Amino acid sequence: MFKRALCLIAFTACVAMLISPMNAGGDKKGKGKDDPKYNNPTFVPTADEVIEKMFEMGKVGKNDLIFDLGCGDNRICFMAAKKFGSRGVGIETNPVRIREAMDMFDKYNKNDAISYGTEVKLPLVETRHGDALAMKDLGDATVVVMYMFPEFMTYWQPIAAKHLKPGTRILSHDYEWDYSALPNAWKPAATATVKSSSRDNHKVIMWVVPEKNK
């Protein structure tokens, strides 16, 4: 009886570890929660009111290609495709979120959706299972959106500076990179505070990539 109790406790502990928030955003390359670049474990959807403010600030339109880093269910790209006809690429490490992105096809009534493996594609929207720090086509983006912690953003900013085209708009929900660690990092072009049904003080920050010699 005592051995059975110990086994039950051990099994319960293992299940708790698997479903805990700290494991919800595990990176497929094995980088764990101790790596600050990947310490963005919990998915919190961006409120629709915040997304609309991002679209407004970034002047998103039909000719834009939006990259959403840590896209979750990829709702931002789907909303932009439906509202503006713009293209979108979402990238996400968590396969659970990838499955939720597949479910988004039904919500947006896309009958021509194609799904295969860990990727899902539409004519306008693509969802990738991968590493947001290793996107080889980042330079194709005209708009980049994210809801990531400052540690990730601080690591990503020099990558963005190397690859993004001048004029690309970067829009972040709540967080900014660490300016003390990046003295030459771009400063915000605009900020706004947004109220939603869950919070009164969402922050939206926008940067615009300058010419390379500035």
Model-found features: residue ranges?
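Glycine-rich SAM-binding Motif I of class I
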Residues: 74-78
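Conserved SAM-binding motif I beta-strand of class I
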Residues: 87-92
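Conserved class I S-adenosyl-L-methionine
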Residues: 63-72
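S-adenosyl-L-methionine
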Residues: 5, 22-64, 98-140
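C-terminal substrate-binding/active-site "lid" region of AdoMet-derived donor-dependent transferases
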Residues: 151-214
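N-terminal export/membrane-targeting signals
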Residues: 1-25
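A short SAM/SAH-binding and catalytic strip from SAM-dependent methyltransferases
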Residues: 138-155
